[in-house]
Amino acid sequence: DICAYISGLEQYFIKTGQIDRVRVAADEPGDFERYRKSLDIVRKTAPAFRYKTAFDHAEFLDHCEEGITDYAPNFYCACSQYEQLKKMQKERPDSRLQWYICCGPGYPNTFLKSDLLEARFLGIMNALLGFDGLLRWTYTCWTDHPLEDIRYGNWRAGDLCLVYPAKNGGILKSLRWKALKRGIEDYELLERIRELGREDVIEQIFHLLLREENVSNYILEDWEVLSDIFVNDYAVFEQARQIMLNNLEGMLE
């Protein structure tokens, strides 16, 4: 019985002290009535669970359910519905608002064909959006022989994983993973600067790295994406990093 199983899971996470970390996730629901009914069943069966929904249709915003703690629109929705999402973020301070990339957009992303600076830019993008984080659906979704061939179906190579299996049972970090980590560090530096009230420094970084600062302009007709959102120059990103470090050093002295 599925309800007994769900209830058992809830009790396990409560007993192990992990219930606050658990999210019951919905992935791009298209049938809102079916989604709502399923959500109601789980709520009644396991009331302690929290909920997370990744959505790729802007219409979902008109069907947002109370009780969902984590919202994650895809890149297209995050940009095209930015003002509406920021309003929702303000109205629901106890919720987390993330955004995600997956098999799209083609740019910026973390495919094998993607410039490594695209992965690093994702940290800057999150700071620009002012959201609570980035969701990437893949980490270890490996093919049968990922060290030889990571192509799968119609997905772009690299879409399914950011790391590879090591012979010792651990993982091998890809250059894409390392570039993303660098971008996360950039984001954390910007957030520390924001906490210290230096919006002028943040604006300086955005002016330096971005060719277009209005995210609403990133989405073109037919869901095409602006092709040159940021300055694709590693030296400029390192210049921005040094500006952030220098300013933080001065603020904390």
What is the meaning of each model-derived region?
Residues 1-58, 131, 147-253:
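Catalytic domains of carbohydrate-active enzymes that cleave complex glycans
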Residues 1-147:
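Catalytic-core regions of glycoside hydrolase
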